[in-house]
């Protein structure tokens, strides 16, 4: 999984430029030779108009509306529900997965607050 933020660090690395640790993106150039190499467990995306935040893994998509999910959450198993019709967030059987994603989202939102624009 990759993010658009990975483009600049990757192009910089391919050009032989030094890594900039203040950037949020990651160098994914190794994936050009090793397609199965992973650089991140989940891809992160933001929908500003809806104040939504997405974490996407290979099998799962988690969407949180509002900084703490106060406006709702959605959880989809994209392997069995690729069109994301069935929200599993309220299902007790999926509570551990939902909790894991909520923890990941809290950590991700805290990490992006300390971004390259502040340095």
Model-derived regions: residue spans:
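Soluble non-cytosolic domains of exported or imported proteins
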Residues: 2, 92-95
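C-terminal cap/loop subdomain of S1 sulfatases and analogous C-terminal strand-loop tails that border
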Residues: 5-8, 13-74, 78, 83, ...
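Phosphate-coordinating loops and pocket residues in cytosolic domains that bind phosphorylated ligands
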Residues: 87-90
């Amino acid at each position: 999984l990759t993010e658009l933020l990975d483009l600049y660090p990757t192009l910089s690395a391919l050009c032989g430029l030094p890594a900039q640790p203040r950037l949020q993106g990651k160098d994914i150039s190794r994936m050009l030779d090793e397609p199965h190499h992973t650089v991140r467990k989940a891809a992160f995306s933001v929908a500003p108009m809806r104040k939504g935040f997405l974490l996407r893994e290979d099998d799962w998509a988690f969407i949180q509306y509002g900084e703490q999910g106060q406006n709702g959450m959605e959880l989809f198993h994209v392997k069995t529900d690729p069109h994301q019709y069935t929200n599993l967030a309220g299902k007790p059987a999926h509570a551990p997965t939902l909790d894991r994603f909520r923890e990941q989202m809290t950590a991700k939102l805290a990490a992006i607050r300390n971004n390259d624009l502040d340095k």
